[in-house]
């Protein structure tokens, strides 16, 4: 069946690696991670994104639906590629940039917090993501495109 609801959110921000998320004690976020998280949450609270997230929340039924998430991380060419060819070490590992972003978009712990520490996100456990695709692309600037699809829960 075709996707009942699909929304695209573009965040004009750099990807952030989970490797840089926590201090050495592994319990406290670094200042950079806190600032990045706040920037994402502020972007999610923008009128156009707030509307899209609300539409997804209103439609989604955890007994009937799952999420398919598509993430595209855009990097300037000089960051993604090395001068001599190949992929630069400055282009993060995809699996390391997925989780921090997914948590901010999905998790209920951010839903009722005041800005910039929270946003009216999807307010649901990310366990409902059953299909996740991510990729790195060259772009004019850093940005992240998040495509959120609500799919019918498979019956098998």
Please report, for each region that a protein language model flagged, where it lies by residue.
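Acidic, proline/glycine-enriched N-terminal capping motif
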Residues: 1-156
């Amino acid at each position: 069946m075709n996707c009942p609801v699909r929304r695209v959110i573009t965040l004009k921000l750099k990807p952030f690696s989970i490797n840089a998320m926590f201090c050495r004690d592994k319990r406290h976020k670094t200042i950079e991670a806190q600032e990045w998280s706040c920037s994402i949450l502020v972007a999610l609270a923008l009128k156009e994104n707030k509307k899209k997230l609300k539409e997804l929340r209103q439609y989604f039924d955890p007994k009937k639906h799952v999420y398919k998430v598509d993430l595209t991380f855009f990097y300037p060419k000089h960051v993604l590629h090395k001068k001599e060819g190949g992929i630069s070490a400055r282009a993060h590992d995809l699996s390391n940039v997925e989780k921090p972003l997914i948590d901010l978009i999905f998790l209920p712990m951010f839903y009722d917090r005041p800005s910039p520490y929270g946003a009216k996100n999807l307010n649901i456990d990310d366990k409902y993501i059953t299909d996740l695709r991510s990729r790195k692309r060259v772009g004019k600037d850093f940005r992240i495109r998040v495509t959120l699809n609500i799919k019918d829960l498979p019956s098998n």
